[in-house]
């Protein structure tokens, strides 16, 4: 049984070797927690989304991201505005300083990815990217319930 879990171990190991040094550096250099940086990164991908949107796409709990957003707004890294169509919704945008931090940090993330993928050929990188996208999309579309249900049925 343990031998069959090598893919999960590999994913976890690579994620740890990628996340730990990068988010540790982000915290030491900018004083931002991982959820706070995830908010900045998410807004770099698409501005005008809600904290709930980021929670759904990132997998972080809503209350964790709510605290992160509040701290980022207070630090003026993120701007929160009321949605014109839905007064209950708050749209999020990068502040000037938040955008600057994102632009300063992204090269390190890219360099780490390049280092991790260096042993792979271009074809292997493309294959890995397609497979990871397929897994991520399935989790995104099925949500946590689908991931938990499929794991429970295989035991």
Pin down the residues of each PLM region:
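C-terminal regulatory/oligomerization modules of transcriptional regulators
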Residues: 1, 122-155
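N-terminal leader segment of winged-helix/HTH proteins
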Residues: 1-30, 42, 77, 155
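Short, locally clustered residues in the helix-turn-helix/winged-helix DNA-binding domain
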Residues: 15, 41-45, 106, 133
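Alpha-helical residues within the helix-turn-helix
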Residues: 28, 56, 73-74
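Short alpha-helical "packing" element that flanks the helix-turn-helix/winged-helix DNA-binding module
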Residues: 36-40
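Short capping segments at the starts of secondary-structure elements
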Residues: 46-50
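Residues within helix-turn-helix
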Residues: 51-52, 63, 70, 90
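Charged, amphipathic alpha-helical coiled-coil/dimerization segments
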Residues: 70-133, 137
């Amino acid at each position: 049984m343990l031998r069959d879990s090598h893919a999960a171990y590999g994913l976890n190991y690579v994620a740890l070797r990628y996340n730990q040094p990068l988010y540790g550096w982000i915290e030491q250099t900018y004083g931002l927690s991982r959820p706070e940086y995830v908010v900045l990164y998410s807004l770099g991908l698409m501005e005008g989304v809600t904290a709930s949107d980021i929670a759904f796409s990132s997998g972080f709990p809503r209350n964790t991201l709510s605290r992160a957003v509040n701290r980022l707004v207070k630090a003026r890294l993120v701007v929160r505005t009321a949605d014109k169509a839905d007064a209950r919704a708050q749209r999020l945008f990068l502040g000037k300083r938040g955008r600057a931090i994102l632009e300063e940090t992204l090269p390190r993330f890219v360099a780490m990815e390049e280092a991790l993928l260096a042993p792979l050929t271009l074809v292997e990188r493309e294959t890995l990217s397609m497979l990871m996208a397929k897994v991520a999309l399935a989790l995104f579309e099925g949500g946590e319930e689908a991931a938990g249900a499929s794991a429970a049925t295989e035991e």
